[in-house]
Curated annotation (Swiss-Prot):
Species in which this protein is naturally found: Nostoc punctiforme (strain ATCC 29133 / PCC 73102)
Residues binding [4Fe-4S] cluster: C66, C157, C288
One Gene Ontology MF term: metal ion binding
The protein's name: 4-hydroxy-3-methylbut-2-enyl diphosphate reductase
Pfam annotation, one family: LYTB
E.C. number(s) listed in UniProt: 1.17.7.4
Keyword 4Fe-4S attached: yes
Catalysed reactions, semicolon-separated: isopentenyl diphosphate + 2 oxidized [2Fe-2S]-[ferredoxin] + H2O = (2E)-4-hydroxy-3-methylbut-2-enyl diphosphate + 2 reduced [2Fe-2S]-[ferredoxin] + 2 H(+); dimethylallyl diphosphate + 2 oxidized [2Fe-2S]-[ferredoxin] + H2O = (2E)-4-hydroxy-3-methylbut-2-enyl diphosphate + 2 reduced [2Fe-2S]-[ferredoxin] + 2 H(+)
Cofactor: [4Fe-4S] cluster
């Protein structure tokens, strides 16, 4: 499929909208009431530090809702206001935050049901309204909805669209897109659908495996087994790694994406020559500004003398996991939670480890005076961060009375 031509056709359709419906002012008031926080603004005004009792909170200087998330959520609210009685569907979670997605359900925005491993688009009728989330949707899903005559509201983050444009450039010049990301993540599923030949690498270790194969060759069947779910149909590592371009899931660790890009640049230099490099390697900057800002702020925060970190965000949020990774690498006790309810009465907390396991830790708040670092993923409202901070203050104050 000529994905570029399809996008152009879709975007000129009268059933397509990616600019909203003119209800920004009304929606802004509603969003501020539901998601913003006076306490968080107070902490910002106090140089991102707040002390109460034995607890000092240090807040990262960039955290929470990014511009792309705010835009997506606002457009979803506008859509319901503009279509008060219509059936509204959404292809995936609008963002990776449980409280926001719960709010979507309360507004009667329904998820496309899944039958087996596939979405059942048969439930969507002609004239229904369908929201594409901030992560985007695959070109195949867009085509199904377009062919059905649905009203499509596209909230895809512009940074994600930028990555799509990059892999389309790779496809045009017959390069394989090496995508740094998680092959199951909605964003990477969408990005790969716009690519021609592609290979998805999770981390630097997998990238090194691919680089070694480019230089030395290897066991083709082992390679294809390793990346069976992370490559394009018919992928042949002996043929399709001669010319490669780098792209990324926008929420991955910036430093790792840069290292992967440099690794493949060095690999192609070694395999070919400096003169031939531009015929075998392409790299464009597709690192999201908001992701980079939050990671940089986290790197600055962990330089302080912290007793522990609390990282707030959806358990399926990739950018939140990357923030947790930074604390883990600094050996700071760190707790990834998605809602304030994970902090239990007494002194226990239910939290997600980097391996995905959900565990409960007792006595997680040390005795005496403590400094707690706080950050949140790009899909986390300030109101959720406020609730967590207030709960920490309350638990610590109760413990002091015992």
């Amino acid at each position: 499929m000529d994905t570029k031509a399809f996008k152009r056709s879709l975007q000129h359709s009268e059933n397509y909208n990616r600019k909203g419906f003119g209800h920004q002012a009304e929606v802004a008031t509603q969003l501020q009431s539901e998601y913003q926080s006076n306490l968080i603004q107070e902490i910002r005004d106090r140089n991102y530090i707040l002390q109460r009792g034995d607890v000092t909170i240090r807040l990262a200087q960039a955290f929470g809702f990014c511009w792309g998330v705010e835009r997506a959520v606002a457009m979803a609210y506008e859509t319901r206001q503009h279509f008060p009685t219509e059936h509204i569907w959404i292809t995936n979670e609008i963002i990776h935050n449980p409280s926001v997605n719960q709010r979507m359900q309360e507004m009667e925005v329904e998820f496309i049901p899944i039958e087996g491993k596939n979405k059942d688009f048969s439930v969507v009728g002609t004239g229904d309204v369908v929201i594409l989330p901030a992560f985007g949707a695959s070109v195949q899903e867009m085509q199904i909805l377009h062919d059905k005559g649905c009203k499509i509201v596209d909230t895809t983050c512009p940074w994600v669209s930028k990555v799509w444009n990059t892999v389309e450039k790779h496809k045009k010049i017959d390069y394989t897109s090496i995508i740094h990301g998680k092959y199951k993540h909605e964003e990477t599923v969408a990005t790969s659908s716009f690519a021609g030949k592609y290979l998805i690498v999770l981390n630097l270790q997998e990238a090194q495996y691919v680089a070694d194969y480019i230089i030395n060759g290897g066991n083709r069947e082992e390679f294809l087994t390793k990346f069976a779910k992370a490559c394009s149909a018919g992928f042949d590592p002996d043929r399709d790694l001669e010319r490669v371009g780098i792209a990324n899931q926008t929420t991955m660790l910036k430093d790792e994406t840069e290292q992967i890009g440099k690794l493949f640049e060095r690999t192609m230099l070694q395999k070919y020559s400096p003169i031939e490099l531009n015929q075998h390697f392409q790299s464009f900057n597709t690192i999201c500004d908001a992701t980079q800002e939050r990671q940089d702020a986290m790197l600055e925060l962990v330089e302080h003398n912290l007793n522990l970190m609390v990282v707030i965000g959806g358990f399926n949020s990739s950018n939140t996991t990357q923030l947790q990774q930074i604390a883990f690498e600094r050996r700071i006790p760190s707790y990834h939670i998605d809602t304030v309810e994970r902090i239990k009465s007494g002194d226990s907390i239910e939290h997600r480890q980097l391996n995905g396991q959900l565990i409960t830790t007792e006595n997680w708040l040390p005795d005496g005076e403590i400094v707690v670092g706080i950050t949140s993923g790009a899909s986390t409202p300030d109101k959720v961060v406020e609730d967590v901070i207030e709960k920490i203050f309350a638990v610590k104050a109760t413990a002091a009375l015992v």
